[in-house]
Amino acid sequence: MKRILSLLLLACLVLGLLTGCQKTPDTPVVIQKDQEQMIHTAQHGRDNSALLAALEVPERFTGDWTGVNDFVHVTADAEIVLPNADKIPTGSIGRRDFTQEDADNLMRVLLKGNTLYEEQGMTKQQALERLEQLQAMQRGEIPVDLDGGYEALPGAIERCAEYARTAPDGDERVPAETSFVSRSENLEEIYGWSEVDGKTMHLFIQNCAGFLDHANVFVDGYGDLNSSSAIALSPIQDELPEPLSVDFPLEDAIRQGDALMEELGFERVICDNAYPVLFTRSSEADDAPSEEDWKSYILATGYELQYVRSMSSFPISWTPISGGAVAENESFSGAWYYEVIMLDITKDGLVYFEWLSPHTEPVLQVEDTQLMPFDQIADIFAKMIMVKNSDVQVANEQNGFITTRNFEITKVKLGLMRIRAKDSFNEGLLVPVWDFWGHSVWEWQGETSDFGEEILLTINAIDGSMIDRELGY
């Protein structure tokens, strides 16, 4: 798994949960859900006051299934992960932007209240050197290395010359604006750098209406405004010549993370996932490092912690699936990404903080949700994993060669998922779902493609209907 630790300057775009108790469909159609019906279904059903006994959940999920004319094969010997909670809630949640209070809080805690300075671009000397380089391209003395080619050179030369006239001579410190500055009708941001305990820290907070709001604070070298500095890489162990090791325990990182969440004022967040990572230059980390020189690429090792909001101690699970997709035959009208706070911690402490898509505090609607027995969920999985992959048969007929899809289920996790209301990107219902994680390997004509670990299927734990995490319903 890879995640670029950088600040992607997003181009800001202008911009009724599960039909309760429905029969599981024979085609993977994802439908809008009716919220009132879902609340009713959550309140009336089996008595599962004792969580494990009521759900009849085994210690492991096991099985072996073949379908779609033997083109799809699924195996499972997976752990079943349940939250540390006695009851399963259902609730509601909303979307919000970062507030000035949020920004002030991040600067107070992560920058320790130190002065925020404007990010500096090229110095005057660097700008003049670049100007000479562009002019040499125009004279034909060196190859043209510029987006747009030779035709783009006059404009680039003019802009570079203009910048050089006012560029700083060196290390000038200009205090930055610490309130949100509007960049366009739908975009406002705060950004700059500060010196904290002898380290340069960068801060970037952006509200982008109808798209993705995000806040990033990081130590210089572990992220970059131009998306070029460092990556946190959680590699497949088999791809490394030696097992990945971290020289301090995970428990220490979680203690640091919990303390930071408390200092930031997050009262109901949970560390829902944690794993070791190594940090390496992004330009050199497109693939796992080679055996010859992989160690020379490593900046540090540490852990990545994922914090999510919770309701009644039940986590609102985050996944790498962003939730910003558009249904087929629908035009883009907005996106609502799932919320997460990610911390990257090395032996030297926090090196990267990322907060995506802030949400409101969840509101409890049903304290003890009634769920479908797990054996029924397992039966639905066995059927729907084949339905979801039934397209392989048509593909094989059209392609003229055989492709097989092999799935290995590695984890089954119960958590809350935010399902947005019909035609709304601002309000959603929190419902319990079963996420089936696993590896998928496709094989054809002697070739293989491994898609790594991902969520293969999400099933509503109340009524057993299928949910598309990308669409958000």
Give the ranges of each region predicted by the language model.
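Helix N-cap and loop-to-helix transition residues
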Residues: T99, P249, M372-Q376, N460
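A short, surface-exposed beta-strand/turn
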Residues: H202-L225, S317-S357, W444-Y473
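Positively charged n-region of N-terminal signal peptides that target proteins for export
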Residues: M1-A11, Q22
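Activation/maturation switch segments at domain boundaries
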Residues: V30-D34, L416-Y473
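Segments that shape or occlude catalytic/ligand-binding pockets
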Residues: A253-W444
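Preferential activation on post-signal-peptide N-terminal prodomains/segments
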Residues: C21-F332
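C-terminal motif of bacterial Sec signal peptides marking the signal peptidase cleavage site
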Residues: G16-G20
